[in-house]
UniProtKB/Swiss-Prot annotation:
This is Penicillin-binding protein 3. Its main location: membrane. The lineage of its organism: Bacteria, Bacillati, Bacillota, Bacilli, Bacillales. One of its GO terms (molecular function) is serine-type D-Ala-D-Ala carboxypeptidase activity. InterPro entries: Bact_Transpept/Beta-Lactamase, Beta-lactam/transpept-like, MecA_N, NTF2-like_dom_sf, PBP_dimer, PBP_dimer_sf, PCN-bd_Tpept. Belongs to the transpeptidase family. Pathway: Cell wall biogenesis; peptidoglycan biosynthesis.
């Protein structure tokens, strides 16, 4: 029993001795742990290792928020901190040690690296001692000693501008008026001025008051309220006549031709927080603009340029790191703004699209969609009335139509003829015997038949089939080829593949699945069925008829050479192209032709009309119609126009389109 008591006392004394002599972490161990936390940017944990004096100077919350924000704003990546050994001069110093360390990191402004020295102090708490870091801001950047601060600034590049073929600006950077208030100059007329100015600028009084109540605003501050378009000088004059209201000039994106080029140029707006998160760090800042639609979006990377960054000490101007901004590149288009405006003026009151090409080179002279919108509204703001009207419009003015697909109607007939000629199943001068207005292949079609407009002609060759737009002739042409041959031929014209173009174009399709029945094959041969084409593709598909049978590759970006790039070679023979042009001349110049009226003197146009009936069945009385006309100047060979207008039922069908399209050749 006595032995047990002695042993117990010995163990207790030993345990007390161990506790009393517990080893304090060495300065090197403390620094190593701190460096690990630093490399992981664990500022919460780092704070625990700071000296008492540092903790008196800055709270944990402020420490974490400040240094976390600096690293985030600087875009710090690949942070690497390494510590050395305790300075030899400190060997005999029991309460203070100096340890050198190296820091390297990648930032938005470039690589930063430096050497510094950490001071560690031995401090006592209630029951223990520990080595703590005597932190100061120079740990983050060496230049931040002596109460200096750091500034991280993004430098926006100049956005590239968009020009037409003749150097006319379609999307430009320019100085525009910005209207604002100097609060101290309002005097006793503050309420009256705010009320009047709100009406003139289409703002609410609350909008203005909130801006005037911002924390930074002083009596002599200029408080910006609204940018206005350069052509609104009258508004600027009226607004600045009010007491305390003045203007300044600011750089802004501007679209000089507004709604006429809206779907082509698209627009930019301020980047959202959500969009910023998805972008590569450092490529955009929270003050950046971003292309949202049209070419502004398609060529965002080229137009945008590269954001510059600067990390510096504002008190001294000393630069810690800097990356210069790289301005965006300009876009020079093949678009001719005069042609663009003429086409838009014809379409602006309708819903539709138009494309103009130089058919020998494939250069796009115009891309028009209607109804449209003014892209400047996204820069300078919309009135509530304008915004509501645009969003309620069932014809969707924000969506381009020249790159969407629609049933082409009878405009497909020349293409179908070309495929037949190429494959030897159709001879231009060979006459088909067609009797009556209706026809079906055999009794397997049941009650279904193909109908033509007139039964006058019973012996029909290609020229007359095109002039009279004979559905039966072209249905038989498709059946003579067969589904496989017709499908292969359509693919040589670019169906079922992406159009090689500098603007996104919806892929044209032959059928929902395939031409799996004779009825569908026949209907497709004259432009009904399930076929879908974009106006841009349809215009391109007529280029083989203008010259030598090659399908020209369309282009939107201006290049040094004006020679054409070929998309598909010899989709029709040169002789076949001439035969088709002969028939298409008759469509316009023969009084039997669907594009004969109205007669326009002085033009030499070959073309084809088309009316696509959008019905659920033949008996559908409420179906709508899209009217088409595709035509080209067969003498000068310098202009090809494809135009589509929706809802032409009760307006003359495709004849409504012909009149508008012919004007383009008259004025060219």
């Amino acid at each position: 029993m006595l032995k047990k008591c002695i042993l117990l006392v010995f163990l207790c004394v030993g345990l007390i001795g161990l506790i009393g002599c517990s080893k304090t972490d060495s300065p090197e161990d403390r620094m190593e742990a701190f460096v690990k936390q630093w490399n992981d940017q664990q500022f919460d944990d780092m704070y625990q290792s700071l000296t008492k004096d540092v903790k008196k100077e800055i709270s944990k919350k402020d420490f974490v928020n400040r240094y976390k924000a600096i690293y985030e704003q600087a875009g710090v990546k690949n942070l690497k901190v390494t510590a050395g050994e305790v300075d030899k001069d400190d060997q005999d110093n029991k309460t203070m040690k100096h340890i050198p360390y190296k820091v390297s990191m990648n930032t938005n402004a470039g690589k930063v690296s430096f050497k510094n020295t950490a001071v560690l102090k031995l401090e006592k708490t209630d029951d223990e001692e520990s080595w703590n870091i005597d932190w100061d801001p120079s740990f983050i950047f060496k230049q931040l000693a002596d109460d200096k601060t750091v500034q991280i600034m993004s430098i926006e590049p100049k956005r590239g501008q968009i020009y037409d073929k003749n150097g006319k600006g379609l999307a430009v950077n320019t100085d525009v008026p910005e209207i604002g208030i100097v609060p101290g100059e309002l005097g006793d007329k503050k309420e009256k001025v705010i009320k009047e100015l709100a009406k003139k600028l289409d703002l609410t009084e609350d909008d203005i008051k909130k801006k005037l109540d911002q924390g930074w605003v002083k009596d002599d501050s200029f408080v910006p309220l609204k940018k206005v378009k350069p052509d609104q000088e009258k508004l600027v004059s009226e607004a600045t006549s009010l007491q305390g209201v003045t203007r300044t000039n600011v750089s802004s994106r501007y679209y000089p031709y507004g709604e006429k080029t809206a779907h082509l140029t698209g627009y930019v707006r301020a980047i959202t927080a959500e969009e910023l998160k998805k972008k590569k760090e450092g490529t955009y800042s929270d003050t950046s603009n971003i292309g949202i639609a049209g070419l502004e979006n398609v060529y965002e990377d080229k137009l945008r340029g590269t954001t510059g960054w600067k990390i510096y000490v504002p008190q001294t101007g000393e630069v810690i790191a800097e990356k210069k901004a790289k301005d965006g590149e300009d876009l020079h288009l093949t678009i001719d703004i005069k042609t663009q405006m003429k086409l838009y003026d014809e379409l602006k009151d309708d819903s539709g699209a138009a494309v103009a090409l130089q058919p020998k080179t494939g250069e796009t002279l115009a891309l028009v969609s209607a109804p449209s919108y003014d892209p400047n509204g996204f820069i300078f703001g919309w009135s509530d009335k304008e915004w509501k009207k645009l969003n309620k419009d069932k014809n969707n003015p924000f969506s381009a139509k020249f790159n969407k697909t629609y049933a082409p109607g009878s405009t497909i007939k020349p293409i179908a003829a070309a495929i037949g000629i190429k494959n030897g199943t159709l001879k231009a001068d060979e006459k088909k015997t067609i009797k009556g207005k209706e026809w079906q292949k055999d009794s397997s079609w049941g009650g279904y038949s193909v109908t033509r407009v007139s039964e006058r002609l019973q012996q029909v060759d290609l020229e007359n089939a095109l002039i009279t737009s004979d559905n039966i002739y072209f249905a038989q042409n498709a059946l003579d080829m067969g589904a496989d041959t017709f499908t292969k031929g359509l693919k040589t014209f670019g169906f079922s593949e992406d159009v090689p173009y500098e603007f996104p174009i919806q892929k044209s399709s032959i059928a929902n699945d395939k031409l799996d029945s004779d009825i569908l094959l026949a209907d497709t041969g004259y432009g009904q069925g399930q076929m879908q084409m974009s106006p841009l593709h349809l215009a391109t598909a007529y280029t083989p008829f203008v010259d030598n049978g090659d399908l020209v590759k369309p282009t939107l970006i201006k290049k040094d050479s004006q020679t054409a790039d070929v998309w598909h070679k010899q989709v029709v023979t040169k002789e076949g192209a001439a035969d088709i042009t002969k028939g298409l001349k008759g469509v316009v110049e023969d009084e039997r032709g669907s594009a004969y009226q109205p007669v326009v003197k002085g033009i030499t146009v070959a073309g084809k009309t088309g009316t696509a009936e959008l019905k659920t069945s033949k008996d559908d009385k409420d179906g709508t119609e899209n009217g088409w006309f595709v035509g080209y100047d067969y003498e000068n060979k310098d202009l090809l126009v494809a135009m589509m207008i929706q809802n032409v039922q009760d307006r003359g069908g495709s004849h409504y389109v012909v009149e508008k399209a012919k004007k383009q050749f008259q004025s060219n």
